[in-house]
């Protein structure tokens, strides 16, 4: 199945000249969604991750099923108001976010961690997750994305980490 055909492109959104990649059409097709997640899991299985870290909302649609299939734990980067207890924060997020927070209990020293998200563009979100994981003593064993917008520098920003993406768009 050509997964790219299952992703709707919305022209001139959020602004003129941008073609938004809408994964909701892929998510609505159960077989396409299952195939995408199973293929990502197949490519990630050898990494022997203990934990998947993903950003809240869109990252969860990839991170949660991957965690289930791979039998790992799941930790979610989120806003502080939603996270009780001691949390690590990181400033300077991409996409206009001021910061993300990760529970300090989520990542243990030497834990093998896979970062998952639905989209790789500039790499800012994934890079932030990586820095937080490493500060907590975890070992990032790779990054995984459903979609990659090539040409925005995301893969280069993550050059020190094995990066997997299923669908690529020239951007």
From Swiss-Prot:
It is an enzyme of class 2 (transferase). Pathway: Purine metabolism; AMP biosynthesis via salvage pathway; AMP from adenine: step 1/1. Keywords: Cytoplasm, Glycosyltransferase, Purine salvage, Transferase. It is found in: Cytoplasm. Its EC number is 2.4.2.7. The keyword tRNA-binding does not apply. It comes from the Bacteria. GO terms for biological process: adenine salvage; AMP salvage; purine ribonucleoside salvage. The keyword Transcription regulation does not apply. InterPro entries: Ade_phspho_trans, PRibTrfase_dom, PRTase-like, UPRTase/APRTase. Pfam families: Pribosyltran. Belongs to the purine/pyrimidine phosphoribosyltransferase family. Homodimer. This is Adenine phosphoribosyltransferase. It comes from Pelotomaculum thermopropionicum (strain DSM 13744 / JCM 10971 / SI).
